[in-house]
Amino acid sequence: MDTLSKKPEQRPEEITAILSSLDRYNPEKISILQEYATTQCADQHSDIEANLALLKLLQFQQQPNPNKEDIICNILSMALANFLTSDFTTALHVLPSYVLDSPAADTLAESIQKLFHLYTLLDGCRFPEFWAVYERDDAHADITADVADFENLVRISITRAVDISSQAIHKDVFRSWLNLSDNKFADYVKELGWKVEGETVVVPPNKENEAKPATTTESIKIEQISRLLKRTNE
């Protein structure tokens, strides 16, 4: 899912002006872009284009920035919650390659490697394993803490994955994917407007999950038909 080509509705005009001009390379705009990234965390939306511009500026920032590590982790955490998009890998490619080297060179690399491990689990649809790993280490919650309602944002993305790929899913499987108790799961499904029939959660049909018949069209010229008919009459 491409998010770079779409301008978020929440993007302020000031940010649009920066991104559409040479100011996107101006270190003096770091504070504005940092503040916008913080707003994204609080408002639960992600603007990957603005965040990529910020990451690039942070690479070459000469002045000490005590918020640098937190900002980078926040951007990656927002991208992690939106794992159905390419935001996480796109942001990762802007960062220095050493951040994934083992052993971790510094605390930033250590945090990024933890987030990367979580991303591989989500990207591979290994959702129960994701929750187990996430809850096993308190550091994960600390790294993602600035993203408001991070866990629920992940659940929304998991739900979206089910919505576009399935017409039905076993209730226990879906509940384990969301990591919810029975009562909270029942409320969650009800809020979605989906139905539970026996042990199955029925996903409403949509243009992504509907079965489509495959059609093949072949172009045959009149001359080919004429030659074929001629051979059958010989």
From Swiss-Prot:
Cited Gene3D superfamilies: ARM repeat, domain 1 (1.25.40.250), Winged helix-like DNA-binding domain superfamily/Winged helix DNA-binding domain (1.10.10.10)
Top-level taxonomic group: Eukaryota
InterPro entries: ARM-type_fold (IPR016024), CSN8_PSD8_EIF3K (IPR033464), eIF3k (IPR009374), PCI_dom (IPR000717), Transl_init_fac_sub12_N_euk (IPR016020), WH-like_DNA-bd_sf (IPR036388), WH_DNA-bd_sf (IPR036390)
Coiled coil feature spans: none
GO biological process, any: formation of cytoplasmic translation initiation complex
Alphabetical list of PROSITE patterns matching this protein: PCI
Subcellular location: Cytoplasm
Keywords annotated in UniProt: Cytoplasm, Initiation factor, Protein biosynthesis
Pfam families xrefs: CSN8_PSD8_EIF3K
A GO cellular component entry from the record: proteasome regulatory particle, lid subcomplex
Reported function: Component of the eukaryotic translation initiation factor 3 (eIF-3) complex, which is involved in protein synthesis of a specialized repertoire of mRNAs and, together with other initiation factors, stimulates binding of mRNA and methionyl-tRNAi to the 40S ribosome. The eIF-3 complex specifically targets and initiates translation of a subset of mRNAs involved in cell proliferation.
Family membership: Belongs to the eIF-3 subunit K family.
Name of the protein described by the UniProt record: Eukaryotic translation initiation factor 3 subunit K
UniProt source species: Yarrowia lipolytica (strain CLIB 122 / E 150) (Yeast)
